[in-house]
Amino acid sequence: MTGRDSLSDGRTSSRALVPGGSPRGSRPRGFAITDLLGLEAELPAPAGPGQGSGCEGPAVAPCPGPGLDGSSLARGALPLGLGLLCGFGTQPPAAARAPCLLLADVPFLPPRGPEPAAPLAPSRPPPALGRQKRSDSVSTSDEDSQSEDRNDLKASPTLGKRKKRRHRTVFTAHQLEELEKAFSEAHYPDVYAREMLAVKTELPEDRIQVWFQNRRAKWRKREKRWGGSSVMAEYGLYGAMVRHCIPLPDSVLNSAEGGLLGSCAPWLLGMHKKSMGMIRKPGSEDKLAGLWGSDHFKEGSSQSESGSQRGSDKVSPENGLEDVAIDLSSSARQETKKVHPGAGAQGGSNSTALEGPQPGKVGAT
């Protein structure tokens, strides 16, 4: 075989390898990577670069003529990457006579597909994304600063409210004297006693209640310091009795027959007697004021009235105090009327019976 035959064979084989330039009578190509690129399974060894003046070799892309543009040929026929390497259309004719770049010299592409010509650096985000991230970061920082300012504004009023103290009541000497006097009589005054103190001292009732609470705490602290454990026990029992309306135990009442000193709870018994005395005084006044009438002040009372009055004088003062402590109800009044069935028609016997403890009326008779 001569050199011309080998050259013609090489040109026909190169035309067969170029995609899009298939010879007549060849089998249809598939869609595989090797078929699309025009690569055969067995390629001959590349020939030397100095064998001819034209484009030679089994896998050489045809050099474009002087009137054709290499970039357009590379875009239409050659795969990606080969057209960029073989763009010689703009070169002078002397350079076009040089041997073209052989396909065998180019490294084969991987079967998974052509590699990108210029991969971008993944670390560099696009400028639009970078600006968006910066704006997001700026907005988040602004929102954080605004939220912190709001929290500071919310915290400052709370601190101001915490620092603000309640107005303390300043008691005068007269007010303290009245309060101490009431405390010596009863450590647990009821609402009526507190209202009376409020009228006397010109203080609100809730301030008086708070003063009594503080005074009781001070008293308990002093008794603990002095070692009065029994007094503290009596004091706690007395407070429970007043708060829950519990009567005085029978054991304490029975032990009081020999006097306060012989009692098992002298302090509790003394406080109980003081409180009972305060209850009896307004009760007796109300009872006498309700039962007094115009008949008590008339001159020339009848003999029946004087006899009933003498009978009432014989009643002991203890029984009189017990009658005063009884609840003033209609049933109690009816019972007192039944005790004296032979009284006058206007009920003068009942009224004169209650006048026994009064010294002025007794002297008049």
Swiss-Prot record:
UniProt keyword annotation of RNA-binding present: no
Motif position, Nuclear localization signal: 161-166
GO molecular-function terms, A-Z: DNA-binding transcription factor activity; DNA-binding transcription factor activity, RNA polymerase II-specific; sequence-specific double-stranded DNA binding; transcription cis-regulatory region binding
Domain of life where this protein originates: Eukaryota
UniProt KW DNA-binding keyword: yes
Domain CVC per the UniProt entry, residue ranges: 224-277
UniProt motif (Octapeptide motif) ranges: 31-38
Classification via InterPro entries: CVC (IPR023339), HD (IPR001356), Homeobox_CS (IPR017970), Homeobox_domain (IPR051775), Homeodomain-like_sf (IPR009057)
Residue spans of biased composition, Low complexity class: 19-37, 300-310
Outcome reported for the amino acid change (mutating residue 247 to R): In KTCN1; uncertain significance; also in a patient with retinal dysfunction
Location(s) in or outside the cell: Nucleus
Keywords, ordered alphabetically: Corneal dystrophy, Developmental protein, Disease variant, DNA-binding, Homeobox, Nucleus, Sensory transduction, Transcription, Transcription regulation, Vision
Biased composition (Pro residues): 113-128
Family membership noted in the UniProt record: Belongs to the paired homeobox family.
Function per UniProt: Binds to the 37-bp core of the locus control region (LCR) of the red/green visual pigment gene cluster. May regulate the activity of the LCR and the cone opsin genes at earlier stages of development. Dispensable in early retinal development.
Disease named in the record: Keratoconus 1: Frequent corneal dystrophy with an incidence that varies from 50 to 230 per 100'000. The cornea assumes a conical shape as a result of a progressive non-inflammatory thinning of the corneal stroma. Keratoconus is most often an isolated sporadic condition with cases of autosomal dominant and autosomal recessive transmission. Craniofacial anomalies and anterior segment dysgenesis syndrome: A disorder with extremely variable expressivity. Clinical features include wide interpupillary distance, abnormal corneal endothelium, unusual pinnae, partially to completely empty sella turcica, posterior fossa cyst, anterior encephalocele, and/or hydrocephalus.
Annotated protein name in UniProt: Visual system homeobox 1
Species of origin: Homo sapiens
Gene encoding the protein: VSX1
